[in-house]
Amino acid sequence: LTGNKCIVDTFDRNFQFNVEHVSLAKKADCVMIAPASANIIGKIANGIADDMLTTTVMACKCKVMISPAMNTNMYDNPIVQDNIARLRRFGYEVIEPDSGYLACGDTGRGKMPSPESLLWYILKETAYEKDMKDIKLCVTAGPTREAIDPVRFISNNSTGKMGYAIARMAMLRGADVTLVSGKVDVPPVPFVNIINVI
């Protein structure tokens, strides 16, 4: 569909002369492996670089995100959990799997998060310069209520859209955002601490 060659062979001689895994690693702003099987997690955690994906990841200097997806029993296996802990210690970001109906027919933890939620991880990492890093920001959004007496209150018709947009952009620019929100019909902003007040 893209017109680009899909690179799977580490040393494909029918392609341009480049050490592909190194050149791909240099081009990347971030890397996300989704879904990440127990096998690929184990290889990376233990420094095994025997295919195009693992050699590229080993050569990366950018942020690497791993999204485990597998059967619940495999995910909960102590060896897999130890490999995930090792990846975190090495600085990889491991995205927690969702719970739900799995491809094997079981129900439980190990489901890959939705593509939309994985996209937010990439956007958070690459969308904007992090010129608001180390800034703590509190944003208010939506309607509020001020009681007049035990029965009546004063409120407004705020939709919260502007406050949510500000919180989203500040998060993408690296700020640590707390969003104090009244009741709104706006989707929650990922990676933002939301405090509901109504």
Segments (PLM) and residue ranges:
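A cross-family phosphate/adenosyl-ligand binding-site feature
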Residues: 1-64, 71-160, 164-198
